[in-house]
Amino acid sequence: IAYPKNYEEFQKHKRELDADEHPVRAKLGGEEVLDIQLRGEYAYAALGKGGFRFYDVAQIDNKDFSEKIVTAPVSPFGQKFYVKSKYATAIATPTTLGVDPLRRHDPQNEEQQIHLMYGFLYGTDKYEGLVVLGNNLKEKKDFAGVGTLLDGNPANNFVRRAATFNPDGKLNGARRITIAGVYAYILCDRGLEVVSLDDPLHPKITAEIGSPVLNEPTGVAVQFRYAFVTDKEGLKVFDITHLDQPKLVDGAKVLLGDARNVYLARTYAYVADGKDGMAIIDIERPEHPKLAQMFNANGELRDTRDVKTGMVSSSQFAFVADGEAGFKIVQLFSPVDNDKFYGFSPPPTPKLIARYKTKGPALIVSEGTDRDRGVDESGNQLSVFGRRGARPFNQQEMLRMYMRNGELYTVTNAPPGRPVDSHTPLKAVEEPDQQKKGSGEDK
């Protein structure tokens, strides 16, 4: 241990964490934070009746600042980082990286164009549906979208509502949003609504999945070709090979008693299972999920609302919003207690290592920064690659890896026939006994 005295004090205080920051209260008519997402120097929050607000957290680790979380470092005349709404419930960024589609590109770098949807933030409102946050492109050409959050220029710190989308009230009761490629997966009273953000100022619904497939859905997370959704019954799996049209995978279900939200980390899904603590589900075979273990730290996890995971050195941790029981940190594995920690996805050996008492119920935990994420589910580049002109596969190139004629390309353990030339159309290849005999060409 690097700091034995600090650790000894930590143990004496029963592993209780300290906080050196005064709670920040919203000034827009609401004080509850229903959702939060950190990106760069700002934390984006959905505040119920308080609408949406962006907090300046640039000095969170600076000892020279006494107030480390502020709504604005200047007067209201110089900054407006909030958007009013009737009842804001959730907020999402297309990526946790600082991707700016409005940034000027040098042609010599041979960079791909960044999709416009990355220039906005996306929130849900209980009554208004989907709220697109950012300045309108036509009205604010100098700082359109939310580019002001990324450009480092303090002279343009103003953000407004760019669009509102709730056709025929289909998004009423919207309470959770997850971005996958150019699609938003929104949970609402009707179930799961898939919304295309290909034109972010003119969204459109491409699919709806409601009862009896989904019953009061609470959380959704996406990994490669699958979406994992929690509802009143537990965890369910959807095939999203076609992002705009999710399909339920028959039998891919894990029954749970109080599922509130889900987070994915490689081959495991971590479900906030309310009064039952945290459910750890093996999703190595996504169409055949199975419960790996339930963990409640001997009853200390008793109102689990949300779980996010993160890595520090060679150890993995789960950060748990445990409702009325406060905030908890669970060590999932470390070199000390798991000899398989070097693997791609070590089996979790969870143990509670720290806790923090909150004045109100702990509801949500921000997702950390994505590491090594070069491309999204729709083939849009997210990261700068090492060489000029280097890029990931685009969508069509990705599909060629695992799709044939619109269907998923699979293989069998036993060869179905003789090898064929990969450049020869399959229809032109015939087995020897099917070839015509007696023709002049058969010599």
Segments (PLM) and residue ranges:
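Feature marking well-ordered beta-strand scaffolds used for ligand recognition
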Residues: 1-443
